[in-house]
Amino acid sequence: FLGDTRPGAYGRAVDRLLSSPRYGERWARHWMDIWRYSDPSGFQKEIRDSRKHIWRWRDWIIDSLNADKGYDRMLTEMLAADEAAPADTAALRATGFLARNWYKFSRNVWLDNIVEHSSKAFLGLTMNCARCHSHKYDPISHKDYYQLRAVFETHNLRDDPLGQTDSSAIMVRAFDSEAATPTYLFINGDVNQPDKDIPIQPAVPRILGGKLKIETVKLPPSAYYPALQPATQEKALAATDKEIKKAHSAIQPAEGNLEKAKLTLSKFTPAPTGKKVTDSNSKPSPPQP
């Protein structure tokens, strides 16, 4: 920039920076903090329930910023891409905002999280208090809270596990209580009354793109036993070495104290032959010269 002395240097620098893919990555970090994006979710053992494909939402945020997509359109896609653009697989990634809050053990927790995160991110309000009572100092009533939550009540999330590869069709089969039970495509409407006229074949969701090829991978023992990994062993050895050095440093003053005790003991006069000093309180020792 400093070397460009031609007129319009500032505008060219701005255009160059805005056209860089790094622009979307830089500002996506800001918006992902507001929209509460994270690769893992949960605490301790709950980490295992993290959304495995949540990174697709992250990429959608970056792509949207680089494409200069309008803020209103981004909000529409995050909250209702499955309704606003059901055939747009790129836009469907935006619904990661809703999936990010999913809590498999309680639907109420999930929906309350959606309301909380939506109000904070898009309205600049905290509506948590209104979940149980009308807000004390903000104009948000108990009724307002559940009217907003009602918007998300019909939303549901499928997290079916995918099984092994079907070698004949090279497709993934979803395990169910009955493997032969047909699967029907649910687009919208009442989930309890699906259209059973057109069954669909088991396959990878189209949004994931391509075919999922599963191959057997032979892993070393360290993959099953983390304690065998070099980094873990080095850490354990370093901790043990530290304890050994600490023990050695404690032995040195103890040895010095032992020598002092021996020297002090040697100054005492030995007891006369046949007369021993007793440490019994019931039998006093004979007088010593």
Task: Label every PLM stretch briefly.
Residues 1-20, 146-289:
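Substrate/cofactor-recognition hotspot
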Residues 1-177:
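Short, structured secondary-structure elements
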